[in-house]
Amino acid sequence: MPANAAAPLYAKERYEFNKLQKRLRRLTGQAIADYGMIQEGDRVMVCLSGGKDSFTLLDILLKLRINAPVNFDLVAVNLDQKQPGFPADVLPNYLSEQGIPFHIIEQDTYSVVKSIIPEGKTTCGLCSRLRRGLLYRYAADHGITKIALGHHRDDILETFFLNLFYGGTLKAMPPKLLSDDRRHIVIRPLAYCKEEDIARYARIRAFPIIPCNLCGSQENLQRQAMKAMLKDWEKRHPGRVETVFTALQNVAPSQLADSRLFDFAALDSLRNTAETTPEHGAGLDILSR
């Protein structure tokens, strides 16, 4: 049996895995439909880092494509940043065995980052920007219409609270994004999926996971704190994390305080006019009780 082959499952384990697989496919398909992520004829580039999230994303998209209502192509793209100890043969071997079209971009961003960032400081920010630029360039040069990333529900929530607590903004990671230069569409098909489900799926499927800390940099401590906070919430108040994520899909600008999103100055002119929609009027009746 190959080193990365999935171990055989017993009946109960197989039943549980099938439920997990169906849930991930359903949630991924729902996110794709809700946000119009993939259209007929798209060339979708799955950014494969070698981590559990991107492996799961690629695997789920390959299976969804079989019965998808639209035709689209998939290509896996990995960026070999020349980090010391990076096992350069792992992804090509796996993708070749699976018959998946792929391309490896070889670019020594590791040396660039190390020459700029002081020792002991996190390199993730600069590394991410360099990586994004290289992937965007590849997409532009090869007719890629959608760039698929493996961010999941927990990533989105962690980012939301990072921006809330440390940035003073109400924003997260959108499931679908137009790049600043308006040339690329980035999609996150796993937006509805829990990290724990993805981790379990990747473990059972025995993907050849590549460690994400080869560069020696540690994940941002603030993000680690957000992850721990969400985990604690879910432990003490089951369902709270899902409720917070649902809130990101039910925004009421009239109940916040951003005058760029809602014209508060115009409310005087609306007095004694026809009743507003629930979004604009919800909560206002409390003031008159």
Curated annotation (Swiss-Prot):
Pathway(s): tRNA modification
Record key words, sorted: 4Fe-4S, ATP-binding, Cytoplasm, Iron, Iron-sulfur, Magnesium, Metal-binding, Nucleotide-binding, RNA-binding, Transferase, tRNA processing, tRNA-binding
UniProt entry tagged with the keyword Magnesium: yes
Single GO term (MF): magnesium ion binding
One GO term (biological process): tRNA thio-modification
Major location (coarse): cytoplasm
Pfam families: ATP_bind_3
Keyword check for Amino-acid biosynthesis: no
Subcellular location: Cytoplasm
InterPro entries for this protein: Rossmann-like_a/b/a_fold, TilS/TtcA_N, tRNA_Cyd_32_2_STrfase, tRNA_thiolation_TtcA_Ctu1
Enzyme Commission numbers on file: 2.8.1.-
Locus of motif PP-loop motif: 49-54
Cited Gene3D superfamilies: HUPs
Cofactor note: Binds 1 [4Fe-4S] cluster per subunit. The cluster is chelated by three Cys residues, the fourth Fe has a free coordination site that may bind a sulfur atom transferred from the persulfide of IscS.
GO cellular component terms, A-Z: cytoplasm
Residues bound to [4Fe-4S] cluster: 124, 127, 215
Subunit structure: Homodimer.
Functional summary from the UniProt entry: Catalyzes the ATP-dependent 2-thiolation of cytidine in position 32 of tRNA, to form 2-thiocytidine (s(2)C32). The sulfur atoms are provided by the cysteine/cysteine desulfurase (IscS) system.
Misc. comment: The thiolation reaction likely consists of two steps: a first activation step by ATP to form an adenylated intermediate of the target base of tRNA, and a second nucleophilic substitution step of the sulfur (S) atom supplied by the hydrosulfide attached to the Fe-S cluster.
Name of the protein in question: tRNA-cytidine(32) 2-sulfurtransferase
Species assigned in the record: Methylococcus capsulatus (strain ATCC 33009 / NCIMB 11132 / Bath)
